[in-house]
């Protein structure tokens, strides 16, 4: 049995995380900290401070043997614990093996077409993903990875051979913007973009459109230049920034207008992108 990894959430049926109905799996932990993260509770592991335990109105949380425990049956899903946590974590994490998680996924068949792993950053657990994907492929389920692209996919060829593709976030193209948004540079993201495209594993390139926090037009141009002649077969998703769930310095940042989104879409199509999704 594989090692147990922290699982933040499992959504049995999703229509926005790849083609068809899919099971979306969110693993806990992230190696960057985006200013616009709308799931900040997936970033870090619990430090057992106990603040959520004291705040829980349903008394569904407790500290046992030095760890926070969660009673799913008692939980009223009010998210008070998420709002209380100052450490960008969640007490509702489950530690599961690939086999245990696959048993849950299999229960959703035949109503799903595949699974999509996300986070946090799911590529922090490549061996777990490899084992999970092998199990899923064995029963005919497709497998997609939703990644921030800061971990080198070239080091995980076996995992990539099992995956149908990677939905890759391109948060910014210029490193100054990238550092401002995430605290790190985008060198590995650009490398992964090129290699995934060449290998036929780039399921989708994703660009968040913000007002004043990145240069999405520059990112779209950078993606087009990198994929080159494959631009016409590269799916591009332009995602409008929304402040829901965001904490910190971008909590009250404005969303781009419809006109701005339409303008970037036109530029993308002028660059040769055919499938451009605006969301």
Predicted regions located by residue number:
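Fe-S ferredoxin-like electron-transfer domains
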Residues: 52, 61, 66, 90-112
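Short Cys/His-rich Zn2+-coordinating modules
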Residues: 10-20, 36-38, 65-68
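Non-ligating segments of multi-cofactor redox enzymes
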Residues: 1-16, 27-28, 49-50, 54, ...
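Auxiliary Fe-S-binding modules of radical SAM enzymes
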Residues: 1-19, 209-279
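Conserved AdoMet/S-adenosylmethionine-binding subsite of the radical SAM
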Residues: 99-252
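Cysteine-centered iron-sulfur cluster-binding motifs in ferredoxin-type domains/subunits
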Residues: 26-59, 67-88, 121
């Amino acid at each position: 049995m594989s090692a147990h990894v922290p699982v933040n959430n499992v959504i049995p049926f999703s229509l926005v995380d790849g083609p068809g109905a899919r099971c979306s799996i969110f693993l806990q932990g992230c190696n960057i900290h985006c200013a616009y993260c709308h799931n900040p509770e997936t970033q870090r592991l619990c430090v057992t401070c106990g603040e959520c335990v004291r705040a829980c109105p349903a008394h569904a949380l407790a500290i046992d043997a030095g760890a926070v425990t969660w009673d799913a049956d008692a939980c009223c899903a009010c998210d008070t614990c998420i709002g209380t946590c100052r450490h960008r974590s969640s007490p509702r994490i489950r530690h599961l093996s690939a086999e245990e998680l696959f048993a849950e996924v299999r229960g959703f068949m035949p109503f799903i077409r595949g699974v999509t792993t996300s986070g946090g950053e799911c590529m922090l657990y490549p061996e777990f993903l490899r084992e999970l994907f092998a199990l899923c492929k064995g029963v005919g389920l497709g497998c997609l990875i939703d990644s921030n692209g800061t971990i080198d996919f070239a080091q995980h060829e076996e995992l990539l051979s099992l995956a149908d593709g990677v939905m890759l976030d391109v948060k910014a193209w210029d490193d100054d913007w990238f550092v401002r948004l995430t605290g790190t540079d985008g060198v590995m993201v650009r490398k992964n973009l090129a290699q995934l495209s060449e290998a036929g594993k780039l399921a989708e390139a994703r660009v968040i459109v913000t007002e004043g926090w990145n240069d999405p037009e520059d990112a779209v141009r950078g993606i087009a230049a990198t994929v080159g002649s494959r631009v016409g077969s590269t799916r591009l998703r332009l995602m409008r920034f929304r402040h829901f769930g965001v904490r910190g310095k971008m909590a009250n940042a404005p969303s781009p207008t419809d006109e701005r989104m339409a303008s970037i879409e036109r530029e993308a199509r002028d660059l040769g992108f055919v499938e451009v999704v605006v969301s």
